[in-house]
């Protein structure tokens, strides 16, 4: 999965897919009532990027729906996965539940078109703080108490704060997520700073073990050729990047083209792939 980073205006969906992304990451901010408000990152952000692009969340979800609905004039079949980077920093552990519940309702109405031929992309809820596991509980309850519980089949979970893996596993379990139940594990830092791959390798080992909790591992945010090769060598499933075309270039190198390929809609993002 080549994951276009910080896609916060509708026009950027096409921009990043045109560069080779089959996945995008979008920032979500919340108002004082814990309701998702804008697709906005703010400063500081990655080097060589504008930090202040934004849309109203509802408008962005409609644009995303058009890009991921077969038959729509804006449909981009390559775009199969969306990571929502949930800016929960101003939430408390108690308001996190409400925020998750309300965000589920927004997705249901504005992305899934109230269950009637909405967008088809898989969704990953990415939360920076393991103490906000109640966001997941609230999100899941919104669907479990409805006639559309099947939409949870399209939803996965990630904690992005680079916490200890055992603490991350515990937070997922507290949120109601079983081991290997649609779990993506991220590791990374802004592209302005280098970061080693020690925790990435630990996450990959967990993914590949008989008693792990992880389905997929991705690293963020990298675009240097050497860093991309190192990530491939570490066995990641996804790379979040500001320059998808760099990932495509490396993917086409002889050392990697026989081992990796771009994920398509037919590839289940919740299924652990065993590297040979």
From Swiss-Prot:
InterPro entries: PLC-like_Pdiesterase_TIM-brl. GO terms for cellular component: extracellular region. SUPFAM superfamilies: PLC-like phosphodiesterases. Expressed by the venom gland. Binds 1 Mg(2+) ion per subunit. It catalyses: an N-(acyl)-sphingosylphosphocholine = an N-(acyl)-sphingosyl-1,3-cyclic phosphate + choline; an N-(acyl)-sphingosylphosphoethanolamine = an N-(acyl)-sphingosyl-1,3-cyclic phosphate + ethanolamine; a 1-acyl-sn-glycero-3-phosphocholine = a 1-acyl-sn-glycero-2,3-cyclic phosphate + choline; a 1-acyl-sn-glycero-3-phosphoethanolamine = a 1-acyl-sn-glycero-2,3-cyclic phosphate + ethanolamine. Its main location: secreted. It holds the Pfam family GDPD_2. The keyword Lipid metabolism applies. Belongs to the arthropod phospholipase D family. Class II subfamily. The active site is at 5, 41 (nucleophile). It comes from Loxosceles laeta (South American recluse spider). It is an enzyme of class 4 (lyase). Dermonecrotic toxins cleave the phosphodiester linkage between the phosphate and headgroup of certain phospholipids (sphingolipid and lysolipid substrates), forming an alcohol (often choline) and a cyclic phosphate. This toxin acts on sphingomyelin (SM). It may also act on ceramide phosphoethanolamine (CPE), lysophosphatidylcholine (LPC) and lysophosphatidylethanolamine (LPE), but not on lysophosphatidylserine (LPS), and lysophosphatidylglycerol (LPG). It acts by transphosphatidylation, releasing exclusively cyclic phosphate products as second products. Disulfide bonds join 45-51, 47-192. GO terms for biological process: killing of cells of another organism; lipid catabolic process. Its cofactor is Mg(2+). It comes from the Eukaryota. Keywords: Cytolysis, Dermonecrotic toxin, Disulfide bond, Hemolysis, Lipid degradation, Lipid metabolism, Lyase, Magnesium, Metal-binding, Secreted, Toxin. GO terms for molecular function: lyase activity; metal ion binding; phosphoric diester hydrolase activity; toxin activity. The lineage of its organism: Eukaryota, Metazoa, Ecdysozoa, Arthropoda, Chelicerata. Its EC number is 4.6.1.-. It is found in: Secreted. This is Dermonecrotic toxin LlSicTox-alphaIV3. Mg(2+) binds at residues 25, 27, 85.
